[in-house]
Amino acid sequence: VVCVICLEKPKYRCPACRVPYCSVACFRKHKEQCNPEARPVEKKIRSALPTKTXKPVENKDDDDSIADFLNSDEEEDRVSLQNLKNLGKSATLRSLLLNPHLRQLMVNLDQGEDKAKLMRAYMQEPLFVEFADCCLGIVEPSQNEDS
């Protein structure tokens, strides 16, 4: 599996069409031509699968919850537990998240029906792009983007 733009090893998948990409720059190029209906069979299969419902467990350790979340994703889409902790420790990210507009965007994205459509729209907003770039900079510190 390779990035659809630069053919490097991918680290992410497009939320709309699930094609692999490796960086913010490649995602931006891809989203210009993204076709969310490119994989309708996969969407039908996923929607036909029963969703796993888990009973909330009281006093469950945060690390265990994060580990369970990580285990639910595809291998190449995973973010390491350490990188998730680094996101939580980032002063820059915390500062961005103090912005009420960004917080509302995040709530809308979390609660939205068509997350891919919302993601495409939000990636046009400079504040959201700054947030995404900040997250990627923490998760991929070796990647230096010209943005």
From Swiss-Prot:
The keyword Metal-binding applies. Its main location: cytoplasm. A zinc finger (HIT-type) spans 3-34. The modification Phosphoserine is found at residue 72. Zn(2+) 1 binds at residues 3, 6, 22, 26. Pfam families: zf-HIT, ZNHIT3_C. It is found in: Cytoplasm; Nucleus. Zn(2+) 2 binds at residues 14, 17, 30, 34. CDD domains: zf-HIT_ZNHIT2-3. The keyword 4Fe-4S does not apply. GO terms for cellular component: cytoplasm; nucleus; pre-snoRNP complex. Residues 45-67 are annotated as: Disordered. Gene3D superfamilies: 3.30.60.190. Keywords: Cytoplasm, Metal-binding, Nucleus, Phosphoprotein, Zinc, Zinc-finger. It comes from the Eukaryota. One of its GO terms (biological process) is snoRNA localization. GO terms for molecular function: zinc ion binding. Thyroid receptor interacting proteins (TRIPs) specifically interact with the ligand binding domain of the thyroid receptor (TR). Requires the presence of thyroid hormone for its interaction. Interacts with NUFIP1. Interacts (via HIT-type zinc finger) with the RUVBL1/RUVBL2 complex in the presence of ADP. This is Zinc finger HIT domain-containing protein 3.
